[in-house]
From Swiss-Prot:
Name of the protein: ABC transporter G family member 11
Residues covered by the ABC transmembrane type-2 domain: 478-718, 1144-1369
Keyword Cell membrane: no
Membrane association type: Multi-pass membrane protein
Subcellular localization(s) per the UniProt record: Membrane
InterPro entries, sorted: AAA+_ATPase, ABC2_TM, ABC_trans_N, ABC_transporter-like_ATP-bd, ABCG_dom, ABCG_PDR_1, ABCG_PDR_2, P-loop_NTPase
Superkingdom of origin: Eukaryota
Residue positions binding ATP: 844-851
A single Gene Ontology CC term: membrane
Any single GO BP term: sorocarp morphogenesis
ABC transporter domain span: 125-373, 808-1052
SUPFAM superfamilies: P-loop containing nucleoside triphosphate hydrolases (SSF52540)
Lineage: Eukaryota, Amoebozoa, Evosea, Eumycetozoa, Dictyostelia
Length: 1442
């Protein structure tokens, strides 16, 4: 945590080679000065604490009081001293690396997967030439030798692809993603292999932020602290006091004290700002108490002042706590750079410099490179590897290194290289003598809690981890109150629907069968609710992977906590359903039976939840998991014992009932209900009718139920269970226990799956390309060609670019949002303009409102109230404003199924003017690819970071910019275009934007951490303070003199020649974590003469714009560039390509259809013409209906995911809502036809339906099934279109599915459906028309011939002489079925078969074969209605909430 890493009583030898050497070698870094500087820093915080403390409520007083006493340096030193005095040890673990080579998969090792991939795999399998072909590889890092002593800080610099992130991951011992890792890595003398057991001691913090969005900052950090509270705390220090102390310390360090009770949020949930979320990520990493920390671009999203504050904090912690710190920053100012001790420069995987930061610049200048004035040292160090950026001194032409291999050779021939090797050797010898690993190992063991194993990788015991995770999981559920309440509301509604359908069932033959349906439906209901948990397993994977690497907890502990959390919430769900359903069903009014009912349903729900989670943990894709779960549901439902009695099951699948949760739950619930329950069949005993009412006939009537003796008109439920279902009521307890055993079994399986299966990439992204399009990796010749392409593109920029912009002005812009308790003003009377030929920078500290202002100016805001005026060329903004403006947003939202080139071409085709030819558009795309240094990525899949397949974070940012540039916008808004980019890429981007401005494009660009070189490209600046108030708007001036003179005029110290003006003004205005200023800058601006000049200039510019830029002559403004037909065609082509490239989704549905078809077909194998087989035909169709309904769950995520990309495209006016809505439906149809046809061929003939069907019936079966599948898919899409997210969809869909399958006429015959529901729901249910159409189709030509076991055989009074005489009245009363003469125990008898043909069966349901094609038309009508609903709700939700 803090104190257990520390120590200041260093060995004398360590002092000589360690700290003292650092002071002498690096005069620009002084530990004492750093400490003194932090004293001032602490005092500033104390002042802020007192200022804000007056406004804090009682709940947060503790945080403020701790903050007032906060002194970081003193805290660390005192904590360390007290820790050592109480018997603690030091964890001083430096890192030494020799000859490190990391090998990764080559770009051509894998290609973009699509529907042809399986066939290509088969060709490779049977082609001998592929058998010996090795997978291509390349060196991500090549022969790197470096080291970092404890207490030192090493900065790793390099361009994208240089290997910086890989070096950090390898140092953090995260090597699973690579083909091989060669070389020697030791940690304080411990080899890397042995050091693996100390997980969490070396940590890697990636640049992206992964947190649970619904937790607050306090809950996030308090949980991490609970998992990392050491056992060797100070005397009398409780766990609670320790956590409070560290919590307040870290929040104060990073300036998020006042955000402690704010939820973290994400791109969809409002919470912390991007910068605040980044500080939380840093804080959480510090809680891990690692001795070796690797920070990968941890300042991304922070302003320059906050980034510097962060670096200083890390510096002081490294000095006082002897932490080993290695960090990689894409953009680092000189201030940050000088905080570090050493710098390692990488290029194409090769180390081209490693040594003191103070000598790096001079080293490269000695090679013949020159540095521009005011250019920061980090920019210079990475810039020398870029042919377009580096400057060669006179006389060195042709003598400087060109390729990465040249640079590496020059480095290894240098004196500094030899000095560093010698220093590393001496450090390793020192480690060998002092053996710091002994103290380290002892300290790790002592830090483990007393209840934990001493050799455990984790600080706290397994039980402690589980308790902490349980509390966190409860917080996750309770913080999402809307989701929780909506789920329980759904349960209540569904409970009433189920209960009313099976309301007050009678104890007769009809009630006998409906009781089974009611009980099975209760099991199915809870199973459907459990399906949603499978999707949730995919959303927290990156957080789990991060916490696992930090050694916070075992993944299996997380699963146990989830299970414990499930129990109360699932119990509430089951109880709410049961209290309604049980008593309205009319089940036995017995308290014991009621609680057994609840207890069994609870076990079944928990077991199903564990089963579906197991699929989620085992499968890499949600679509694979969903398809597998659908097959299992069909299997479980079929072999539950209801649709097919056990005696009727075929041997090849009957084994499944022994491992079926549904079977045991159903058997237990049936035994619970039927034991001791009396049934009567007097009304339905055969024969019946007015002629048989006398008691003298009772002895000659028989219940239509197998096994009951003639004359017995009453029977026990136990008898029915035993004779008909082959269930034993005495096995109820055993079945309940088995249900819970399955739950425990799947819980254990999930624990093992979470421990040993990891589908995340660990932050590593692997690129995949189109087949045959992969470039060579880290190849010298390829490097030279790429440099030549970029050089040519740069030189031709002026000839290619030509923009026709205008003057854009804004005045008195105010933006207000509603917050609890009132309103909040986020922008306060902002004024300004942009015009051709000028670049305007928008700057301010984190939370100042920069992004908010851009959203308002770009007309992207959909929430809140915007006031003020915006004009383009003196006129009001027209409908085409969003299309003719480019907005590079901070979030990089791209469709992962496309390649980089395809994404750019799509933007160019739909946003450039229709008069521009396709050839010209594509030519411009290629030029932008070259300019953005993405030519080699053109055929690379964009992919996602979560899967680890696709382009990197930095490359996504470049793509975001490229997508806007290829549209040739007239105005360009850029929100953090260089965030996450290295210095050289940032330089190229800003240089490119400068060219756009010079070509006539007006633009404004927010920027957090501009170097002085980048800052010089801007002409004007709009500087904002917190609260959205203007600090300054005006010219920057030559060498920033105009800007700096404004601040100097208000009493700020002069800006030096070597200082970065951007950092200077942020410091002056009090930006940063703990920055403050004595000047009220917004008030100063209001009183300044510059503001008066601005007002006059605005009026003049509006008039100038109206005169200079005449109104368009080509007709009214168009919202979209292309016609609706063209948009639809292009959107459909794109979606079709995405579907083609998702074999998990497409082939998953095919395989699901095949498996379900085979399972159902062989389950109902070769059906005959008996009456029992008639029922089997009905359940065959019911299973097919369930397959269609389960498809709903599969298609919903696709629409919700694609809709997010649509919203981003719609905001930029790529295309309208109609093309997307119609395309997302149509793109599914061909795949549905294939899936339905596969199911048809796998099931129709195996079930023997062809024997009673002609060609027309066979075609009808296929056709109506395909149409029904169309309905199901479109229904799922319509529901998804209504819902705001997947969670809400998974809550709503079970409620709607209830109406589909319960009211279709199978679970309950139409005549038995309550009048209320039968009057409207039954007739509005598409499944009812599907069942009527397809059942009448397959039964209309079936002739029933009852088998002996299906025949009801009864004797008759001898006075009637013949069976015909005795049953004549019965046959006239009930015309269906037939009676024939039989014998019973050697006596003459009657045999009654309930049906003589299939037509008699469906006529009892009120169905007719004459309605078959009418039903097809009705289902098509429902399909069209669903499409209209998709279109409507895509339209209503086309604008995201922002």
């Amino acid at each position: 945590m803090v104190h257990n890493n520390d120590g200041d009583n260093n060995d004398q030898e360590m002092q000589e080679i360690g700290i003292n050497e650092k002071r002498s070698q690096f005069p620009h870094i002084s530990v004492e000065e750093s400490r003194q500087e932090f004293d001032s820093f602490s005092n500033n915080i104390e002042g802020e604490s007192k200022q804000f403390g007056m406004n804090r409520d009682a709940e947060s007083n503790m945080a403020v009081e701790s903050e007032e006493d906060f002194k970081l340096r003193k805290y660390f030193e005192n904590s360390n001293r007290m820790h050592l005095e109480n018997g603690g040890n030091e964890k001083k673990m430096g890192v030494s690396i020799r000859n490190l080579t990391v090998v990764g998969l080559g770009a051509d090792a894998s290609v973009i997967a699509d529907m042809s991939t399986p066939f290509y795999g088969l060709v490779k399998l049977f082609t001998p030439s592929f058998w010996t072909k090795k997978t291509s590889t390349f060196d991500i890092l090549h022969d790197v030798t470096t080291f970092c002593k404890d207490g030192e800080m090493v900065l790793v610099l390099g361009r994208p692809g240089a290997g910086c992130s890989t070096l950090l991951r390898v140092i953090a011992n995260q090597t699973a993603s690579y083909v091989s890792v060669k070389g020697d890595i030791t940690y304080g003398g411990i080899p890397s292999k042995e050091f693996e057991k100390y997980r969490g001691e070396p940590i890697y913090t990636p640049e992206e932020d992964s947190h649970h969005p619904t937790l607050t900052v306090r809950e996030t950090l308090d949980f991490a602290l609970k998992c990392k509270t050491p056992g060797n705390r100070l005397p009398d220090e409780t766990k609670r006091s320790f956590r409070d102390k560290v919590f307040n310390l870290l929040l104060s360090m990073f300036g998020i004290v006042h955000q402690a009770d704010t939820i973290v949020g994400n791109e969809f949930i409002r919470g912390l700002s991007g910068g605040e979320r980044k500080r939380l990520t840093i804080t959480e990493a510090m809680v891990s108490s690692a001795s070796i920390t690797c920070w990968d671009c941890s300042t991304r999203g922070l302003d320059a002042a906050s980034a510097f504050d962060y670096a200083k904090s890390i510096r002081i912690m490294s000095d006082t706590l002897h932490k080993t710190t290695i960090a990689s920053f894409y953009q680092a100012s000189d201030s940050i750079y000088n905080v570090f001790d050493k710098v390692c420069v990488l290029e194409k995987g090769r180390c081209i410099y490693f040594g003191p930061v103070g000598m790096a610049k001079q080293y490269f200048m000695s090679l013949g490179f020159d540095c521009e004035p005011r250019k920061s040292t980090p920019d210079f160090l990475t810039g020398v590897t870029n042919p377009q950026e580096r400057i060669i001194k006179k006389g060195f032409e042709g003598r400087t290194p060109e390729t990465s291999a040249d640079f590496e050779e020059a480095w290894k021939n240098s004196d500094i290289y030899r000095d560093q090797l010698q220093e590393q050797k001496e450090y390793e010898e020192l480690i060998e003598r002092t053996q710091p690993k002994v103290a380290f190992v002892q300290e790790v063991r002592d830090a483990n809690s007393k209840t934990n194993f001493k050799k455990s990788q984790y600080t706290t015991s397994f039980v402690t981890q589980v308790i902490a995770l349980i509390k966190r999981n409860f917080a996750l559920v309770l913080n999402d109150k809307f989701g929780m309440y909506s789920k329980y509301l759904s349960v209540l509604i569904q409970g009433f629907v189920y209960a009313s359908l099976f309301y007050n069932m009678d104890t007769d033959i009809t009630g006998l069968f409906t009781r089974g349906g009611a009980i099975l439906s209760a099991v199915i209901f809870n199973a459907f609710l459990s399906i949603g948990e499978m999707a949730m397993t995919f959303y927290g994977r990156r957080v789990l992977q991060k916490h696992k690497s930090y050694a916070l907890y075992r993944p299996s502990a997380l699963h146990i906590a989830q299970v414990v959390t499930d129990i109360p919430f699932t119990a509430i769900q089951v109880f709410l359903f049961s209290i309604i359903a049980y008593f309205m069903f009319g089940l036995q009014y017995d308290a014991g039976k009621f609680f057994i009912f609840c207890f069994t349903l609870l076990g079944a729900s928990l077991a199903c939840t564990a089963l579906f989670r197991c699929f989620g943990y085992l499968c890499p894709s949600m679509y694979i998991a969903q398809n597998i779960s659908n097959v299992f549901i069909i299997f479980m439902l079929t072999y539950s014992g209801y649709t097919i009695p056990i005696p009727k099951m075929h041997p090849w699948f009957s084994w499944f009932r022994h491992i079926n949760i549904f079977t045991y739950a159903f058997k237990a619930l049936m035994a619970n209900e039927f034991e001791g329950l009396d049934f009567n069949c007097k009304e339905s005993a055969i024969p019946y009718g007015p002629a048989y009412q006398g008691s003298e006939f009772d002895a000659y009537r028989i219940c239509p139920l197998g096994g009951i003796e003639q004359g017995s008109l009453y029977f026990k439920g136990d008898f029915y269970m035993d004779k008909t279902l082959s269930f034993a009521t005495g096995e109820m307890s055993q079945n309940v226990i088995i249900v819970y055993c399955w739950w425990v079994f799947f819980v254990v399986c999930n624990m093992f799956a979470m421990e040993y299966i990891d589908h995340t990439s660990g932050g590593y992204t692997h690129k995949v390309y189109k087949k045959g399009k992969a470039p060579k990796m880290n190849d010298v010749e390829e490097e030279k060609q790429q440099n030549a392409i970029v050089a040519k593109a740069t030189s031709n920029m002026k000839d290619t670019l030509h923009m026709d912009g205008g003057i854009f002005t804004w005045q008195n812009i105010r933006y207000t949002v509603k917050v609890p308790g009132g309103e909040r003003l986020l922008l306060d009377n902002i004024e300004g303009w942009i015009k051709p030929g000028q670049m305007t920078a928008l700057m301010g500290s984190s939370g100042a409102g920069k992004t908010t202002l851009l959203d308002v100016l770009a007309k992207r805001k959909t929430l809140g109230v915007v006031e003020g005026d915006s004009h383009l060329n003196g006129r009001e903004l027209e409908i085409d404003f969003e299309r003719i403006t480019g907005y590079v947003e901070q979030m990089d939202v791209h469709n992962p199924g496309l390649t980089v080139r395809e994404a750019l071409r799509f933007s160019a085709k739909l946003r450039q003017e229709p008069e521009v030819s396709l050839e010209e558009k594509f030519k411009y795309v290629e030029h932008v690819l070259e300019m953005m240094e993405m030519k080699h990525l053109g055929d690379a899949l964009i992919g996602t970071l979560e899967t680890g397949v696709g382009i990197s974070v930095e490359e996504r940012k470049r793509l975001t910019i490229g997508v806007e540039l290829v549209a040739k916008p007239q105005i360009l808004f850029l929100d953090e275009p260089t965030s996450g980019l290295d210095a050289q890429s940032s330089y190229n981007i800003i240089k490119f934007i400068r060219k756009l401005a010079d070509a006539g494009m007006p633009l404004v660009c927010t920027i957090h951490q501009p170097s002085s070189v980048l800052f010089e490209h801007f002409d004007r600046i709009l500087l904002l303070a917190k609260g959205g108030k203007t600090v300054y708007f005006g010219d920057i001036g030559e060498k920033s003199k105009t800007l700096t003179s404004y601040f100097e005029r208000h009493g700020v110290r002069p800006c030096t020649e070597s200082e970065n003006p951007a950092e200077y003004i942020l410091e002056a205005t009090g930006a940063g974590v703990h920055g403050k200023s004595d000047v009220n800058w917004p008030e100063a601006w209001k009183q300044s003469p510059e503001l008066a000049d601005i007002s006059r200039e605005l009026a003049a510019l509006k008039e100038q714009g109206a005169q200079q830029y005449k109104p368009r002559s080509d007709g009214p403004a168009r919202e979209f560039s292309q016609s609706t037909w063209y948009q639809t065609k292009e959107v459909y082509k794109r979606l079709n390509l995405i579907w083609w490239r998702d074999p998990y989704y497409t082939y998953g549905s095919f395989v699901q259809a095949a498996l379900c078809g085979l399972i159902i077909g062989f389950t109902f194998w070769n059906l005959q013409g008996s009456s029992s087989d008639m029922n089997q035909r009905i359940f065959f169709i019911f299973e097919a209906l369930m397959l269609g309904i389960l498809l709903i769950f599969v298609v919903m995520p696709q629409l919700i995911i694609q809709r997010e990309y649509f919203k981003r495209d719609f905001a930029s006016k790529f295309y309208s809502w109609f093309p997307f809505a119609i395309s997302i439906v149509v793109v599914e149809l061909p795949f549905i036809v294939i899936s339905g046809t596969i199911f048809f061929f796998c099931s129709f003939w195996t079930a023997g339906l062809h024997k009673t069907s002609d060609d027309e019936q066979t075609f009808y079966f296929w056709f109506i099934f395909i149409i029904f599948m169309f309905f199901c898919v479109s229904f799922g899409q319509a529901v998804a279109a209504v819902c705001i997210n997947m969670f809400f969809a998974m809550t709503l869909i079970p409620l709607l599915i209830v109406f589909l399958f319960l009211f279709c006429g199978v679970m309950v015959p139409p005549s038995s459906i309550p009048t209320f529901w039968r009057g409207w729901v039954y007739h509005l249910n598409p499944c009812r028309y599907f069942m009527e159409g397809i059942i009448t189709n397959i039964l209309k030509t079936v002739r029933v011939e009852c088998s002996e076991e299906d025949m009801a055989i009864f004797t008759f009074p001898k006075s009637y002489n013949t069976c015909q005489n005795y049953t004549s009245a019965f046959q006239s009363y009930k015309p269906s079925g037939y009676v024939e003469s039989a014998t019973l125990n050697g006596e003459p008898a009657c045999g009654y078969c309930i049906y003589k043909n299939g037509e008699e069966y469906y006529e009892t349901l009120g169905w007719s074969a004459d309605n078959r094609w009418r039903n097809v038309g009705i289902i098509i009508g429902f399909f069209v209605f669903n499409i209209l609903m998709v279109i409507l709700f895509v339209y209503l939700t086309r604008k995201g909430s922002r």
